[in-house]
Amino acid sequence: MVKLDIHTLAHHLKQERLYVNSEKQLIQRLNADVLKTAEKLYRTAWIAKQQRINLDRLIITSAEASPAECCQHAKILEDTQFVDGYKQLGFQETAYGEFLSRLRENPRLIASSLVAGEKLNQENTQSVIYTVFTSLYGNCIMQEDESYLLQVLRYLIEFELKESDNPRRLLRRGTCAFSILFKLFSEGLFSAKLFLTATLHEPIMQLLVEDEDHLETDPNKLIERFSPSQQEKLFGEKGSDRFRQKVQEMVESNEAKLVALVNKFIGYLKQNTYCFPHSLRWIVSQMYKTLSCVDRLEVGEVRAMCTDLLLACFICPAVVNPEQYGIISDAPINEVARFNLMQVGRLLQQLAMTGSEEGDPRTKSSLGKFDKSCVAAFLDVVIGGRAVETPPLSSVNLLEGLSRTVVYITYSQLITLVNFMKSVMSGDQLREDRMALDNLLANLPPAKPGKSSSLEMTPYNTPQLSPATTPANKKNRLPIATRSRSRTNMLMDLHMDHEGSSQETIQEVQPEEVLVISLGTGPQLTPGMMSENEVLNMQLSDGGQGDVPVDENKLHGKPDKTLRFSLCSDNLEGISEGPSNRSNSVSSLDLEGESVSELGAGPSGSNGVEALQLLEHEQATTQDNLDDKLRKFEIRDMMGLTDDRDISETVSETWSTDVLGSDFDPNIDEDRLQEIAGAAAENMLGSLLCLPGSGSVLLDPCTGSTISETTSEAWSVEVLPSDSEAPDLKQEERLQELESCSGLGSTSDDTDVREVSSRPSTPGLSVVSGISATSEDIPNKIEDLRSECSSDFGGKDSVTSPDMDEITHGAHQLTSPPSQSESLLAMFDPLSSHEGASAVVRPKVHYARPSHPPPDPPILEGAVGGNEARLPNFGSHVLTPAEMEAFKQRHSYPERLVRSRSSDIVSSVRRPMSDPSWNRRPGNEERELPPAAAIGATSLVAAPHSSSSSPSKDSSRGETEERKDSDDEKSDRNRPWWRKRFVSAMPKAPIPFRKKEKQEKDKDDLGPDRFSTLTDDPSPRLSAQAQVAEDILDKYRNAIKRTSPSDGAMANYESTGDNHDRDLSSKLLYHSDKEVMGDGESAHDSPRDEALQNISADDLPDSASQAAHPQDSAFSYRDAKKKLRLALCSADSVAFPVLTHSTRNGLPDHTDPEDNEIVCFLKVQIAEAINLQDKNLMAQLQETMRCVCRFDNRTCRKLLASIAEDYRKRAPYIAYLTRCRQGLQTTQAHLERLLQRVLRDKEVANRYFTTVCVRLLLESKEKKIREFIQDFQKLTAADDKTAQVEDFLQFLYGAMAQDVIWQNASEEQLQDAQLAIERSVMNRIFKLAFYPNQDGDILRDQVLHEHIQRLSKVVTANHRALQIPEVYLREAPWPSAQSEIRTISAYKTPRDKVQCILRMCSTIMNLLSLANEDSVPGADDFVPVLVFVLIKANPPCLLSTVQYISSFYASCLSGEESYWWMQFTAAVEFIKTIDDRK
């Protein structure tokens, strides 16, 4: 057999450790970054929304807030401080948090309270509406909040609009709760901004480019716009026919322009219907559906209301004030443009209403020129949405893992909200929601929460976030999860919910602190921070590997006692092979911790010690009970277990020598189990597999009490899990359950169940499930099997049990990737579902062949073969419940372990064995599998067979072995479970070697009996054990007979000689399965304890069993494996000569420790540690060496094989880390994008706020502005004009600085204000400054425009006059650059025009760089393209633009601006010289 290279293994383990450490550090950093970003996002969003509300107040300039107060409030908002709620509310924070949480989750109550407040004329209803949006629903950043708010709006339609006498008037007034909330929601909805920008940006920019005239369609108003002299010049003499005719011509011309403009808007509206926000569409369709049912409302009126909501409340405000929505950012909108936009908005609304109401007769003529259904069709699309009950989510939820756990609310808002609710309660408007509100208010403290005085004195600049802000479980990220992300997975509790500081309090000079009040949700698990064991366990449970260790509570992070268990080493277990796995798992990657003691400490922490003590105590008591029972039935004698019997004698080379009385003979089962385990071991002798059975048993311990006792605090704590559970009750219950369970299918693996959830085991779990995942004994084989069926037998099991169901629903369910294993699982399903063995048989085949060669230790084929044979035993023997129980306890392995094993077993079973001795070997191999596994296999494989198969065959074949085993059992019986040898698992040599082995062992070991020697206490114990086992077996036999059809099927299974073997194995499997089931529970039941004690020596490592106390043997293997993994993953490989291994009688010689490869490796490492004076490492290595020295070479090879197998099985953990990292990176990127959006919104609101303030300032200076314009007209020299403009701007800047409104402005605001003043002033004098020579300039521009138009017809990108390099022609004709320069007319100040030119040049350079990434484009490449772009775009007034900028901005040009300006003027000059005729 191939030898496992310890150096390679160490290398891989070290790489794994380094990778895992770095990934964990990165994940920790990412978690911190995500939290910081989320916190910043929520705080910024809270402030931004308050600024927007403040802006609305400024625009309305209501009596309550003067512009100066709004400005002061804006400044205060920027300095908002966020403080944990308890600092002001003290212990009452919890009550308020619960109140807010329950209120938030009751949209109906909120809606009815707001309506009731309006009916009662509560003056603070509006501020409460703001609080609901900004605080309770956190500005709807999270989809959960958005969904709640949509429900509130739906209830408001029902309670407010539906009940109103004139809902349309109520809606148009815009002061009802629905209107305010809808406005807040639609303004903040990002998808709404996207829709508005996509729809309106282009048409509005085109309108600004052509804004020369008011598009007035009312003749009377048209005339009023001109002074008398202008009227006469334009229309002729007033009152004449010519005058009226000219006026009519102008009106028609304006109408034609307006129709073209509006059609452009409608076209964009239709084109972008696809991106209309789903949530708004849902609200509109809900309104239509709800109000259509009202008898007094006609359909036309309902439709008109939907039109009002859609156009008057959503689209038209954005058309009229695009700057406020960020649709237009840098192009100022002058008076003419604003008027034209208002005309467009008015026409859109009228067009939407065509057919539903008679329009203004004056507009009929213009409306007649439109397609009647143009806007109505858009409305139909929106209303036509199916009115489903649940609100849609606005977009793909990239923040799935995030959830809000706090509310941001100021103290005054909180008090206002509570008082509002109390006043609503006292009023009589609530109807059926009264009770709900009463319950909510009942829990609030009667008095107002007091502000702590300290708060007022200390400003909290950096209030802490409440704990809620932590990324929570991203469990779905487990590699195993099929879903890339389940909602819970990423649960990141961002507590930052920006709740608003009360909008109304503007007078305060100190910023009002915003309280961060926790909603009371518990802290969640952080993505990527699950331990290795948890991840691996989770995979098992979700993957359906019989192992269902993690209960749903655990998945959700709820505390549960089962948690402790599953935490132990389960993780790895599940994933890693089996028993050994468990042990491995213990040391799981957490090894990182590098301190051994940390390894075990999972949630269970110190449970280990207590558990051990408990176990010992219980063991003692139960032992007595078992002894009593056994004595009653004289089981020992029946089993033929005599103290002196030498094992070697018992073993006969053939199975059939002894005739067993009947299948029901208790000893048969036990013996068989043992035999099988032994046989498996034999076959595997050579294999690296770790101790055959021992591994499993050990694992069991993890789950079960067995191990836990043995477990040392430092290394094995993890293993203890189930032990810590209260022993007595559980055991009793479980035993009862087992008894009541019928058949394999129905019996549930207690361990499994328990781990799955804290409830008592459910019969539904099939034994099989327990079996599969863990056998470490045959790592290779198993691995292969596992790879084939990673979920091992238990696959469906998990589904069957209720617990599993829960788990599957759990957000964290991980499903292992589909693999052959799934098919295997499917085959095994029947077991889980109680259907009986028959279905099970199919899978055998799969197990036979490993899916891929084992990476490390190869496994003997023999080990794999023989599955079939095994199973049958089961059947013929029909284990009684008692037997099963005993067996189970003997091997108590966690189901998980069993699972993987079973796969191994199954594989071994598969091979038919014709020759008894050959059969025997497979049996041994099987034995090597953890018995649990064997069991699992059996149950899985067993199919109904004729029950005729002769017990005698079985018995004869295995009797001798069985006898031997029974002796062992005997000795085992009296020992505390931890001392027992784990018989079934113990590997045995192939039969031919068996006797020799025995003899040698006898020589070497203390007692005649190999097992007894293992336990170190020979015979006396055997009899007690035998009795106990028999007793238990009997008990269960009867139960099985009574209850389990599947057992019957199994019994039938053994029909052939091969079956004999099968029977053994199946029995074995069954037992072990049972054991596994029992294992999870600590042995409290007396029978159970005894059974636990039955753990047989076979389960122990060979050398350990011979040399050490049984107690040590059971534990030492796992312990050694854990420590060895730690040593290997921290070692630097040092080469040393390959050792030769001498073998004696076909067995590795374990007498010469110096031959042990591991020991030699460790010695080198110790030498290095001494050399480096690394005391910690020295201590760890020496302790590891002490543990390893006890084992013989064969066991050491098994140890390495087991570690290698565990290494392979940890792949899902690596995948989990990778997915968590990717998920966190995605979340972080999305949060940053959200933050960008919020910051942009805030910037837009602040700029518009500044613009409104400037407008107010300029209105107060209107007289001065008129004087300035008159003076400007009189000037002729360009320099004088420039100087005059500069002087007047400086005058206005000074006036602004002295204005009370601007006292609190920041430097940035002042700069924005100066820019706004410049734009406003230049807008007023634009025509005078742009066309100083008036008509002469206009005509000159027209000539150039026509010249360029002709050029554009003949000039192409590859025209020889341009000489554009060929490499750049692929991006021609550079449309984005053309569109940039075409908008230059929309900008009125020379600065803005230069910026427009700069953007065009930058766009061209970007496109050129894109075309040729190898070189940077230079001026020779750039200028020809610029010329071509100008020819194709042909912007109006090119010459006047050049003159305007040169006159008013030339002195300000510098740097980049100056360079691009020079290129631009050169291109214009060049264009002038091109002759289009040539």
From Swiss-Prot:
Record PTM Phosphotyrosine, positions in chain: Y460
This chain belongs to the protein called GTPase-activating protein and VPS9 domain-containing protein 1
**Subunit architecture:** Interacts with TRIP10/CIP4. Interacts with RAB5A. (Microbial infection) Interacts with P.falciparum (strain 3D7) CK1.
Q: Where is the composition biased (Polar residues)?
A: 578-588, 758-777, 1012-1023
**Where this protein primarily resides, as one coarse class?**
membrane
Residues found modified as Phosphoserine:
227, 466, 566, 569, 742, 746, 757, 766, 876, 902-903, 908, 914, 966, 1019, 1046, 1096, 1103
**Which SUPFAM superfamilies does this one have?**
GTPase activation domain, GAP, VPS9 domain
Positions the record marks as coiled coil are: none
Site for Arginine finger, residues: R172
Instruction: Keyword check for Cell membrane, yes or no.
Output: no
Give the UniProt subcellular location, in the record's own words. Membrane; Endosome
InterPro entries found in the cross-reference section: DUF5601, RasGAP_dom, Rho_GTPase_activation_prot, VPS9, Vps9-like, VPS9_dom_sf
Bilayer topology reads: Peripheral membrane protein
A Gene Ontology biological process noted in the UniProt record is:
regulation of protein transport
